[in-house]
């Protein structure tokens, strides 16, 4: 097992949470981190999830308690050990005020970055891993600016699409609007950043 393994388990696309046979006496509705069943959370670099259950799993060590999460974008399921919540970077959705700040950030002038695509890719990859929307926005702005000057490499194009998806999906949920509408708002802000 690699030394950075965080205990997160990806489950088959159609795996039902009932398949884990969580013992009733160990099933919870709120964890010590305050996340509740039914709450929407962000799993860094993957997107918005919903907590389906909090409890043990027979496929891991007894005594470990997990968040049983369902990805909203594709309905795949994950289990994250509660003890690894900080390491994984699991967080609550941003609030309206933070989303307004995000749009202001998207509209600011783009900061200079590596001219070498490999250095730029490494730098952007580290930002994506944080799970903070501000860092994901910096990646999106950076790659958007580069794409206006030249074609993105295959890896950078995938990263651009991932960054856009992560921002669009969270903004849409927080603002209560359809994703295409959120995407238009983000595109407008990105255009403003290029106009400086």
Language-model segment annotations:
Residues 5-24:
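Short, positively charged and aromatic/hydrophobic N-terminal segments
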Residues 22-88:
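A positional/architectural concept
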Residues 88-196:
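Charge/polar-rich, low-complexity and marginally structured segments
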